Amino acid sequence: MAKIIAFDEEARRGLERGLNALADAVKVTLGPKGRNVVLEKKWGAPTITNDGVSIAKEIELEDPYEKIGAELVKEVAKKTDDVAGDGTTTATVLAQALVREGLRNVAAGANPLGLKRGIEKAVEAVTVRLLETAKEIDTKEQIAATAGISAGDPSIGELIAEAMDKVGKEGVITVEESNTFGLQLELTEGMRFDKGYISAYFATDPERQEAVLEDAYILLVSSKISTVKDLLPLLEKVIQSGKPLVIIAEDVEGEALSTLVVNKIRGTFKSVAVKAPGFGDRRKAQLADIAILTGGEVISEEVGLSLETAGLELLGQARKVVITKDETTIVEGAGDPEAIAGRVAQIRAEIENSDSDYDREKLQERLAKLAGGVAVIKAGAATEVELKERKHRIEDAVRNAKAAVEEGIVAGGGVALLQSAPALDDLKLEGDEATGANIVRVALEAPLKQIAFNAGLEPGVVAEKVRNLPAGHGLNASTNEYGDLLEAGINDPVKVTRSALQNAASIAALFLTTEAVVADKPEKAGAPVGDPTGGMGGMDF
């Protein structure tokens, strides 16, 4: 495909137009009085949202240079969302302010590389100041306030705080759509995976259609079990111990399954067979997780273990195992706490090194099952459009609350950024580097000014007033009053604020140092293909 190339000011201005188009659509959502944006979908109902990254992802511009500019800012929003789960609109507003000020200085003759170094040093100084002023979050009320602000609904904040209180900061909180109106919280004790018993005959409670085994042995096998002779030596040992047995394998079929079922019905021996969760390598990893949690071993030819020679020492144990037709829950596995902690650390390292959102999500679920628990928030609403929007808000708020617990909180409403500007006074910079630091100083005011503008106030007046207030005091845009924001429960996780600034500065530096842009040449729309037969003139259909 043919390419088109733009140089110097033309290249940078083309990128800036794309950035501005995207940022202008996103920034209307900032603050408690921000508005929503309606996104058309090819299929189904349109989506109404105030989430920066969701809006950014939908924007596709026609002009090739503008398109590249918009894509660069999408990267800011996406990276901030990946790292902190919120702050995407703030990051976009900061990027726009940094680029606008930076390009003005480049046009006036400043050296882009000098500006880049100045911006980087200034951002580092502000980040250090933010982390120094961050306040640790330790109460349920503070978590509720943080999550409530992110979701724009205090009741959602309270529910998330309750969920985090129950499952711990390592636990997973998932959000599901509900058919009933309102919000519900469901908690899962122990490790749960979405595979149930292979045969309904295994149920110990026919009314509830579930099998409950107390103080059970757990046999983990990576392959299929079909012949009973493989299983018999081990079954005899388990029967002698007097404990029930849960078999988790790729599959249990044929005479092996019928033997287990017959013994269960006769009351000779209580057991349940369950298919292992997942597929391929993911199945192996999940079986290994269960083995570590229960203190057992996965019987696999890969590690030289076979069913015929297996003894009780290779079986895992748990205080209780509850199995329904769809899922299995293992409560209080007998695994070594040190081994579990080691496995948790290993999974956490895999999460950090993973590039795929899907893989990261699956690893996060495995981490939660080992380290904490699982809480499910079920959200319902009157219409499908409202339900989607509400679910998205809750998911953002959950990640926001986790970020707050991780690194602490600072005053919200754009105040923490503006009041971190004095950190730049200590930098001894000269020339273009000093100009770069000043670009950051101007940009630090942008989020607060946008919040004030969306609330119908004069941005410049608000920024000047907040600059002269004590640390942590600022504008409460929902009431248009000034006061102590942390006390009023208006806070942001420092991880969100820090990530927004760092990611915005990273993209801004790329914009300023760009000297040429190479883009695909737009194809001209061809004339519609005519009817080769010439049609059938005079015919009236």
Swiss-Prot record:
It comes from Rhodococcus jostii (strain RHA1). It catalyses: ATP + H2O + a folded polypeptide = ADP + phosphate + an unfolded polypeptide. One of its GO terms (biological process) is protein refolding. One of its GO terms (molecular function) is isomerase activity. Pfam families: Cpn60_TCP1. InterPro entries: Chaperonin_Cpn60_CS, Cpn60/GroEL, Cpn60/GroEL/TCP-1, GroEL-like_apical_dom_sf, GROEL-like_equatorial_sf, TCP-1-like_intermed_sf. CDD domains: GroEL. SUPFAM superfamilies: GroEL apical domain-like, GroEL equatorial domain-like, GroEL-intermediate domain like. This is Chaperonin GroEL 1. Forms a cylinder of 14 subunits composed of two heptameric rings stacked back-to-back. Interacts with the co-chaperonin GroES. The lineage of its organism: Bacteria, Bacillati, Actinomycetota, Actinomycetes, Mycobacteriales. ATP binds at residues 29-32, 86-90, 413, 492. Its main location: cytoplasm. The gene is groEL1. Belongs to the chaperonin (HSP60) family.
